[in-house]
Amino acid sequence: MKIERKWAMPNKWTFTIKPIAELLKEEIVGDYWIDPFSGNNSPAQITNDLVEKAMFNKDALDFLKEFEGNRADGILYDPPYSITQARQYGKKEFSSMKYWADCKNEIARIIKPGGKAICFGWNSMGLGKNRGFEMTRILLVAHGGSKNDTICTVEIKSNPNLTH
């Protein structure tokens, strides 16, 4: 597993942070990537968010349920990092651990064997072995001062029989 730590200024648009943009440029292979929480600036071909600039404007879990299994080259998983951020969207279920687990189960179902899940947040949990994924890379992006690091994990779907 490759573990890196880099420093960069924080930005509300995760994918514009230089070390993260570089990671995505290296890791995104194929032309069928999905981003259920895209916001702005997502490199995925299929984007969804509650903001108007996304291709689709649906609840992320409902959006993920629409895809066929074992098809996507990869999924970018960059949900709101905290309950406070999640509540800004006004959806009560965003503060439920079950909601996030259900999203991860759908992501595991959608990604094809050998495909990637690239997750962003304040922890390194990713999708995990119990969903058939093996972590290959961790990028810690330090922002200094009182700002939490952004943690990026790259996982490969190595066992398609364990999707949840």
What kind of feature is each model-predicted range?
Residues 1-164:
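Class I S-adenosyl-L-methionine-dependent methyltransferase catalytic core
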